[in-house]
Every structure is written in structure tokens, then in C-alpha cells.
Amino acid sequence: MIPKNVIINVAKEVGFDLVGVVAAEAMDDERKGFEEWLLEGNQSTLAYLERNVEKRFNPTLLVEGARSIIVCAVSYLSPVSRGYDATCRTKIASYAFARDYHLTIKEMLAELAERLGHEVEGLRFRAFTDSAPLAEKSLAVRAGLGWIGRNSLLVTPRYGSMLLLGELVINKAVDSYDVPMQGVGCGSCRACVDSCPNRAIKPNRLIDTRRCISCRTIEREGEQCEDIGLDGWIFGCDACQSVCPFNRHAPLHSNPRFDPKIDISRLDEAAWQGMTNDDFLAMAGDTPLVRSGLERIRKNIGK
């Protein structure tokens, strides 16, 4: 059995801002809500969300011998996360200016597992970061990191919602497990709902991906509402996060691995239109921007 304080201390030393630990078990209530969301068609072109639903909400089906899950979060909040000038037509979600978080967090989780392996004999693990069907936000809530805001994102008291999640599923029990937060939440605040240009935020903390700018600028193109626009966003969208009071009062990130690699001040429309693919890859080769590619980003300009 692993002492929880050892896990937390090592995870913080690795560079995570928040850490919680939960038992690996089925999350039936959360699965029911997700299945209802799917039945309403909110997933749009995100067909992968329809697969492996049972595994998504039961980690023991994903990882043989799973006993515990270490849930980690790290802030990426930077000055650009506070919002753009209203006239900007080349807005990019602030997480995309840094190295691809899938790579960085996987490295951090591997370091965490290696260091814990020195403390615990026979430790086996599997690392996740938005890379397999695992209900990350549900696990984060169960681990006491925060709550689900009206915009469907995890919100935390100290760091707001500009966070990236990673999980380590391990084969060992822990001496104590965390529980969900009590007495905190969004209250009557509707800033995120009111700020969404396309009314993508539905009641009950749900998102209609057909209207969500982040989905429309990044994911596979397909069915969408006729009245949708991109409001100047060309990759992702921070509209519902930049207005959140918890983000406005959160500290900027302190982990240098998430420092922006791209100078946003030079990326106006003319810069994008005059950029070659080689220029693009040299600038953004290991950032999330390559997921869309230069042609798709240009196509989003002016929509």
C-alpha cells in the first residue's frame, strides 16, 4: 500500500499543480449522463466519443489489475489566456502556443511513475492524457480537484479552468483516497454561458459540439448549424474561459514546460497568409497547431 502523501509530494516535485488519488472503480452515474448527451446528438462529428463508453467510465476495463488512479493537473494560464482585443481576427486558444501537452504531460507522468517505482516494489502503471477513452474530468472531480463548471470544464478554486489533465492508473492500493469538494461551485455566475458567441453551452453543463468554436476549428468538419461563426478564432477558443472569475484571479502558470513557444504579436492575418508550410512547421512543429495544419488555419480566418 502506498502512502498518499508520498504520491502527492513526488507529483508536485515533477511539476504538477494539483494532485488527487481515487480508487479505480466504475463511474455509473457519470456514464448515464454521458450516454444521454450522446443520444441527443451533441457529439456531432466526434464519432470516437461513441466508442468504448463502458471502458471510459470504468478504468478497470482499460487497465488489467487497476487499483488506484493518480489524477494530476497543471496550469497553462498565460497572459494571452486573459483574452484578445475585440478586433482580433486570428485568435488561438492559449494552450496551443506551448509544446503539445500530450507529449509534455506523458513525460511528466513517466517521471512520476519512475520515481514512485523506486519507492514501491512491483509497481505497474499506464499513463493517460486525453489519449484513450478515460473520463478525465469525472475522475478529477472524484479526486477533489474541482467541479464541473457551466461550460463543462473542470474548474478549481486556485487555478481556475486553464488546466491540463493527466492520469496514472496503478496496480497498487493507496492508504487513503480523496473525495469530491463540497460547498464550492459557480453559484449564480453565467459569464461563460453569456460569452459563448454561438450559444454552444447548454443547460446542465453540457456542450453542443455543432456550435462549439473549438470543435469547429480543430475537429473533422461535418454537420454544423447554419448560423455558426468563428468570431475571429482560427484554432480552438478560450471565450468561455477568459471571462471566468476563477481564471481572472488565478496565478499565471509556473512550469516552464508550458511557456509559449510562439510570438502571437507577429501573427496577424497577413502573416498567416504569407506563411509557407516550411515556415509553419519551423514555428509550430511540436505544438498542437500542427493538428489542423496551415491550410485549415487559413481557411478559418475571416469566418
Q: Which residues are covered by each model-predicted region?
A:
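Auxiliary alpha/beta "docking" domains used to position bulky ligands
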Residues: 1-185
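Iron-sulfur cluster-binding cysteine motifs and their immediate structural context
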Residues: 26, 191-214, 220-223, 229-257
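Short, charged low-complexity linear segments at domain edges
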Residues: 155-180, 206-226, 277-281
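SIR2/sirtuin NAD+-dependent deacylase catalytic core
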Residues: 188
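Short Fe-S-cluster ligation motifs
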Residues: 216, 220-235, 266-290
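Conserved Radical SAM active-site core
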Residues: 244, 248, 252-277
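Long, compositionally biased charged/polar accessory segments in the mid-to-C-terminal portions
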Residues: 282-283, 290-303
